[in-house]
Amino acid sequence: EFLFKKNKVTYFKGIGSFKSANKISILDDKKKETVIETEKTVISTGSVPVSLPGIEFDEKIIVSSTGALALDAVPKKMVVVGGGYIGLEMGSVWSRLGAEVHVVEFLENITPGMDREVSTEFMKILKKQGINFHMQTKVEGIKKSAKAATISTSNKDGKKVNFDCDVVLISVGRKPNT
């Protein structure tokens, strides 16, 4: 909202519907309707974290990036599933706060879409921070108990490895609210 105000953009929050090409009805949380006329409209629907098939976020042991920001304490051991920007940022924060962090990534490199050389250098920096990487490794399942989880994985050679941890951060992408 700050950036909207700073850039002189009018911000409305609510349920919107187009009355015509340039008229929009906005119903706020108090059911008050506001009708606005506009030349240009930006619709920002937001997004939600994507999980792995059959695995649900509980935001305590199996967390999304939102849950990772709200943890009550620094976990002893965290496994980050996914080597993209969001998971690496969260993993880096928790590592610097004292957690042992392992990143499990299905692909060969972290930060898909980034220049390979930059990605390689970025990974070196994160390793110096103490983050452990398990590349070309597939998550096959997660078993959760009351206070921990075990992640079952297999690497590109078929070797099976289990990771025990206090928190699993699943950071494999986001899906738009459409």
Tell me the role of every PLM-derived stretch.
Residues 1-11, 39, 45-49, 122-133:
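Helical element adjacent to the flavin cofactor pocket in flavoenzyme catalytic cores
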Residues 14, 39-40, 60, 66, ...:
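Structural detector for helix-capping/boundary residues
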Residues 19-21, 27-28, 32-61:
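Glycine/serine-rich phosphate-binding loop and adjoining beta1-alpha1 elements at the start
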Residues 38-40, 44-50, 66-68, 165-178:
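Glycine-/small-residue-rich beta->alpha transition segments that form the dinucleotide
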Residues 45-99, 104:
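Glycine-rich dinucleotide-binding loop and its adjacent helix/turn
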